[in-house]
């Protein structure tokens, strides 16, 4: 049995994949919500995939680590994928790749924006997968304004990263974003997105017929697997999806998501690809689905599950709530909503206010 651990709000990733695209896994994969973990006794032996690690609070991470310690005991006869003791999350991964010369672009936390930066840069959330929340910023003044605007929109500076921009456009001006999964060391090419925007998300994917043929060749050939394996290993990630580009033939890693969308779920594409073009992607989707299903089956222990009594320390239980990190607290969302009508006027004050906001946030942090 495979237990896929995830927060309740993010469980659609594996749930939709199994229900809509891989029903043969329904009796093998069980979704377990982090929020229910302490009340779920006994647990059972099997393979545990810990996803969405960036959504866990320190208390939630402590619960996971104490659980993993018990799963690793020989008598537990269980496997663990994505041990947080080894996993590098977004900031740590990008910083490590840059320092080792494996990524051209660097990263800094917003509360440490005095770090040397190579402009242009953009701002994004550290623990969410929403892409850039700012345009490209070309100097410190623009960066200060962007951070100030982010605070007024309900973001906390401690949750934000400043990421250096890396130009990856093709000679024709188009951008390519490659994606590949890993399951216990097995790399599986997922898709190739092509569009006209540098921050390429699914709504900007607009491939031509020729580019779809390139995508099919990429997925079937798994052409970058040898280059991706050491990156996944460095990141300590056994299950997840890497998003990356190629710069002069080298991998430029954008992120590795430990709870990625696997295939399109119940929601329609925000900007659908024309049907006559989209149909050409069906062989790619079928190939990927078959490969991922086989990879998931391969990590099952093959042993019948049996009850496993798990105990957590008193200190762990005291600090376990909340389990899940909230990027925008309710009170902050309410404040941002209340001041939204005044934002145009407030933005004009950003040049004056933002340095003080940033400085105050750093002082509160220290």
Residue ranges and their predicted role:
Residues 237, 246-366:
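C-terminal active-site "lid" helix and adjoining low-complexity regulatory extension at the edge
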Residues 1-3:
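Extreme N-terminal starter segment of soluble prokaryotic enzymes
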Residues 141-221, 225-231:
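Phosphate-binding site of ATP-dependent enzymes
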Residues 58-71, 91, 143-148, 276-285:
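Well-ordered, non-membrane alpha-helical segments in soluble/globular domains
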Residues 121, 161, 188, 240, ...:
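Protein kinase-like catalytic core scaffold
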Residues 115-133, 154-171:
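ATP-grasp fold ATP-binding core
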Residues 8-117:
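Conserved N-proximal alpha/beta basic substrate-recognition cap immediately N-terminal to
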């Amino acid at each position: 049995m495979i237990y896929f651990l995830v927060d309740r709000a993010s469980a659609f990733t594996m749930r939709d994949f199994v229900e809509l695209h891989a029903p043969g896994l329904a009796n093998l994969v069980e979704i377990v919500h982090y929020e229910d973990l302490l009340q779920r006794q006994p647990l059972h032996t099997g393979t545990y995939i810990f996803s969405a690690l960036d959504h866990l609070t320190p208390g939630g991470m402590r619960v996971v680590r104490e659980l993993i310690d018990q799963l690793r005991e020989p008598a537990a006869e269980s496997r663990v994928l994505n041990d947080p003791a080894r996993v590098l999350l977004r900031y740590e991964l990008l910083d490590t790749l840059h320092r080792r010369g494996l990524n051209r672009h660097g990263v800094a936390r917003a509360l440490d924006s005095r770090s040397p930066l190579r402009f242009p840069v953009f701002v994004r959330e550290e623990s969410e997968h929403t892409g850039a929340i700012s345009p490209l910023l070309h100097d410190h003044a623009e960066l200060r304004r962007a951070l100030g605007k982010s605070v007024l929109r309900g973001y906390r500076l401690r949750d934000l990263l400043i990421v250096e921009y890396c130009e990856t456009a093709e000679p024709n001006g188009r951008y390519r974003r490659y994606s590949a999964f890993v399951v216990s060391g097995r790399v599986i090419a997922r898709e190739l997105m092509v569009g006209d925007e540098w921050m390429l998300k699914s709504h900007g994917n607009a491939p031509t017929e020729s580019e779809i043929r390139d995508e099919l060749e990429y997925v079937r050939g798994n052409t970058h697997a040898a280059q991706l394996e050491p990156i996944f290993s460095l990141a300590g990630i056994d299950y997840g999806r890497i998003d990356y580009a190629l710069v002069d033939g080298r991998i430029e890693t954008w992120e590795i998501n430990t709870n990625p969308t696997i295939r399109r779920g119940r929601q329609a594409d925000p900007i659908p690809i024309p049907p006559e073009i989209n149909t050409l992607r069906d062989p790619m989707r079928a190939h990927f689905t078959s490969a991922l299903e086989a990879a998931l089956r391969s990590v099952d222990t093959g042993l019948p599950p049996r009850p496993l009594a798990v105990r957590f320390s008193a200190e762990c239980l005291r600090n376990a709530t909340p389990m899940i990190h909230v990027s925008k607290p309710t009170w902050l969302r309410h404040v941002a909503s209340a001041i939204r009508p005044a934002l145009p006027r407030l933005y004009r004050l950003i040049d004056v206010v933002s340095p003080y906001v940033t400085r105050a946030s750093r002082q509160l942090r220290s």
